[in-house]
Amino acid sequence: KAELPQLLRTIPQLEPAERAAIGAAGNAARGQIERALELKEADLAAGEIAADDAIDVSLPGAPSLPVGHVHLITQTRRDIEDVFLGLGFQVAEGPEVELVEYTFDALNTDVTHPSRARTDTFYIDDDTVLRVHTSPVQVRAMIAQPPPIYVIAPGRVYRPDNDATHTPQFHQVEGLAVDEGVTLADLKGTLLAFARAIFGPDRDVLLRPHFFPFTEPSVEVDVSCFNCDAGYMRDGSRCPLCKGSGWLEVLGAGMVDPNVFDYVREYGYDPDKVTGFAFGMGVERIAMLRHGVPDLRLYFDGDLRFLRQFGAR
């Protein structure tokens, strides 16, 4: 029914003189139409191939791969920070390569104290060390801000130790609260709130006398064991976690020694007017207790069988 074939069929009916010219014109037109159709067909085929190969940018990037998560140490540190931020503390930070002055001298640590020995501290030179605790951050915070001050100092610290419960590099969170009328009862109340937030609402804390150069009095702080009842399991056996004591050693603390305040007296810390408490804990230790990790080195071995047990929260 197309017009061109019908026209070509009428050629025999034409005068002989007209047949050749009209036939040639008709064939030329048919050739042009066929070539145009072939080109169009090729374009459509190419478009279909392109559509098959097109990338849908709305699809997930790698749906078959498991999503990573925060490392257990990072998550534990964040949990600790959240507790103290909720209690009104602020986060303070400082350098990891620190002055001996801020690491020891300002913290009432005598020149003969064993912690200053090269067997216990990484020395860069005679005046500079890799910090052995984040306490220098507290000194810097007091120099930068007059009282009252409530800060925590999380960060990496370094000591030449390497065994199941010690690594050359680990993480601490230390805290400092200085104001008028701060007492040991305030310290205990703060740490009780921390213990219940981290280890459970039924926990209690026990303060045992101890010695630290920068606090007086000084205490070791234990948390009631959450794995047993007063040191014993339901079957009557001794608790493997607390070794039957009913308590778990968690951190060290105490009231800031007046000699520390005397070092920063010119910045508003008159030991006759202000008092304060300080505390410090190892993040790895907290994570070990919360999650039953037996060896500190597991945190840093990069073993995915271990790391995948602790997903993001």
Task: Describe these PLM feature segments.
Residues 1-4, 51-53:
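Core structural elements
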